[in-house]
Design a protein with these regions (language model features):
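Conserved ATP-binding subdomain of kinase catalytic cores across diverse folds
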Residues: 1-120, 124-127, 168-192
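An alpha-helical support segment within catalytic cores of ATP-dependent transferases
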Residues: 119-154
């Protein structure tokens, strides 16, 4: 698969950087990466495309899970358990590949501010969630005031649509770019 990045920002693209680190560590949680192309312009340089392994017969996790639920399988299945294990493996492997940092007051405030921004966008996009606004904000306020673990690099925009079930291999995660319209500086900073 050849992926061309539609939004370019000066600096390493997290999709290339994170998957390259996981692939180099021998992770089976991501497609093998064959290479990337960098582009340069006045005062800037970034990845413009990446070539990755094509995953034959893959179905995205959203499709797999909703099919299971629609079939009446409401219990935790091996597939769901394996999906949780994949998520843990990716976070552990990223923690080993990139240096964790302390959750300073400044880092905490920056992350909490991003949570508020995302919540505002989500509530604007889905007005039916407005009745939950107070609970969401209260949760963020409470999270700000507890002890935080160290922060580390995490997969960006990680959700069921970014995970594929591959016959004979199991779950594989892709698209570590994060939300491309968010500033690169936010997408590469260590997180929870």
């Amino acid at each position: 698969i050849l992926k061309v990045f539609r939004v370019l920002s000066d600096g390493a693209n997290p999709d290339v950087e994170l998957q390259q680190a996981l692939d180099a560590a021998g992770s089976q949680a991501v497609p093998r990466q064959y290479g990337s192309v960098r582009g340069a312009w006045d005062g800037g340089e970034t990845d413009v495309l990446v070539a990755q392994e094509f995953l034959v017969g893959a179905a995205d996790a959203w499709q797999v899970i909703t099919n299971e639920l629609n079939a009446g399988h409401l219990e935790v299945t091996d597939e769901i358990r394996d999906l949780g294990a994949l998520t843990a493996d990716i976070h552990r492997e990223l923690g080993e590949a990139f240096t964790a940092v302390d959750a300073t007051d400044e880092a905490r405030e920056a992350l909490v501010a991003q949570w508020y921004e995302r919540a505002d966008r989500a509530l604007s996009d889905a007005p039916e969630l407005a009745e939950h606004r107070t609970a969401i904000i209260d949760t963020f306020d409470q999270a700000r005031d507890v002890d935080w673990p160290t922060l580390q690099r995490v997969p960006g925009d990680f959700h069921l649509g970014q995970v594929l079930h591959v016959p004979g291999r199991g779950w594989v995660a892709l698209d570590f770019e994060g939300e491309p319209l968010r500033p690169l500086s936010q997408r590469v900073q260590p997180d929870l």
